[in-house]
Design a protein with these regions (language model features):
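Alpha-helical multipass membrane-protein architecture
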Residues: 1-462
Length: 462
């Protein structure tokens, strides 16, 4: 479905010159370095670009052996933990793995670029924005919430954890509250008690609420007029040089995208109707997820194209379906997959279109390569995942794996915990009137109003 959204929205986030997609410029720089002919300057030939690239590649590979395999401590060095190795507070404050990471640093580039991607790619204003948000949360919000206010009984739980806990701080045994249909067992849930989270995990969800609300407001205020004008008269707008050159190629017929979108939705409906016992999502859930993905693809694509930061749609999709059909985690996961993943796929496809736009790759060739690549990657990834699950003993079970095992699946653990929070237990029993974290819903309002303040300041001080 993401390819269909991308085809519909190309003229809004690919053709405009100011939708520059920072990450694509890095790829273009690499391709140019490897393929352009070099000219002598002042009769001297500088070091060949390819030679420099190979040297940097070899040096990077050799260095990664140390933090990646031989001395993994280099991935996160905490000064506070080194000075006070037996202090719990020092570990909470200074640990880069299980704490706030204040004063910690890394000598591993993959650690730097693993979550928010390379800081060398994002524009300076976006980096400053991310750093201010990081400093606000880590240096102010978290210390005040944990040590000052003991917010949500923070001291009962680890300061930094994505696990779920009981009210006494013990790990929540999710298997006890799941019945044979993979739905919540209410009598057992009442016995075990409410689900609790670490304060950091809870605040992360709060800022996630604010992020998705701020995305809509920001795009409406800063880009709403332009989107409307392009919708009204895109054909009369003077194209930039890249768009003019790309018109020398045959464009992709719109029906390619519409057909692919229709087939994808039809196959999804077949799964929902004829494999309802396995998928557990009603047919209207698929259509709702598709509509939600289409609505958010444009604003999130604009944010990505101008800042290299991509807000996630996972929280809002989980929240909505969890409120509509609580107690059904499989339904929630399927809804999130169709809503969030299709949007993420659309953003990635639009980024590839912009790369082809810059490099003057024929649009039809770009479409076919991406489509075939997606089919191959999807099949291979499924096969590799199935092979790992059947060949690696105790994979993703951290307590049963040997020390320093690479198969702990932290991302999948968060995905599972999210399915418990939003699908199995439901937002009403966690973020609603029956839960401990209802105050976090105010973050939605903060996210809606935040960009308004920035927009007013921008108008007053352009």
């Amino acid at each position: 479905m993401g390819y269909g959204w991308a085809g519909i929205l190309r003229k809004y986030v690919v053709e405009p010159a100011h939708m520059w997609w920072p990450s694509t410029l890095v790829q273009i720089s690499l391709f140019t370095t490897l393929h352009e002919k070099e000219e002598k300057k002042d009769g001297k030939r500088p070091i060949a670009r390819v030679k420099f690239f190979v040297i940097a590649l070899v040096c990077s590979f050799c260095w990664y052996v140390f933090p990646g395999y031989l001395f993994q401590t280099l991935q996160s060095i905490s000064l506070a933990c080194l000075v006070f190795p037996h202090s719990v507070t020092a570990h909470q404050v200074g640990s880069g793995m299980n704490g706030l990471g204040i004063g910690a640093f890394t000598l591993d580039w993959t650690t730097v670029a693993s979550f928010l991607f390379s800081p060398l790619v994002s524009p300076f204003f976006a980096i400053v924005n991310v750093f201010i948000g990081y400093a606000l949360i880590i240096y102010l919000v978290m210390p005040v919430s944990y040590w000052g206010l003991n917010l949500f009984n923070a001291k009962t739980f680890p300061i930094y954890s994505s696990d779920l806990f009981t009210a006494q701080g013990q790990e929540y045994n999710v298997s006890l509250i799941v019945n044979k249909k993979f739905e919540i067992d209410f009598p057992e849930y009442e016995k075990l008690g409410r689900v609790h989270m670490s304060t950091f995990f809870a605040i992360t969800y709060g800022f996630g609420f604010a992020t998705i609300a701020a995305t809509v407001t920001h795009v409406a205020l800063f880009y709403g007029r332009e989107i409307y004008s392009r919708y009204q008269a895109s054909s009369r707008e003077k194209p930039d040089v890249h768009t003019r050159l790309m018109r020398n190629y045959k464009d992709i017929p719109s029906w390619w995208f519409y057909l692919l979108l229709a087939v994808s939705i039809l196959l999804g409906l077949v799964l929902c109707i004829f494999f309802k016992k396995d998928v557990q999502m009603p047919w209207w859930g698929l259509l709702f997820a598709a509509a939600l993905a289409f609505f958010f693809t444009l604003p999130i694509s604009i944010i990505t194209a101008t800042t290299n930061q991509t807000p996630g749609l996972n929280i809002i999709t989980e929240y909505i379906m969890g409120a509509i059909l609580p107690g059904q985690p499989i339904t929630n996961v399927c809804f999130k997959t169709y809503g969030y993943i299709s949007m993420a796929q659309a953003v990635a496809f639009l980024s590839d279109f912009k790369l082809g736009h810059y490099m003057k790759i024929p649009p039809r060739s770009m479409f076919l390569v991406q489509f075939i690549g997606t089919m191959l990657a999807g099949t291979i990834n499924l096969g590799v995942g199935w092979w790992l699950l059947s060949s690696v003993e105790n994979i993703c079970h951290k307590d049963l794996l040997p020390a320093n095992s690479p198969w702990t699946c932290p991302g999948d653990k968060v995905f599972f915990d999210a399915s418990v929070i939003w699908g199995l237990v439901g937002p009403k029993r966690i973020f609603g009137s029956l839960g401990e974290y209802s105050t976090l819903n105010w973050f939605f309002l903060g996210g809606l109003l935040g960009p308004v303040v920035v927009w007013l300041l921008h108008k007053a001080f352009p």
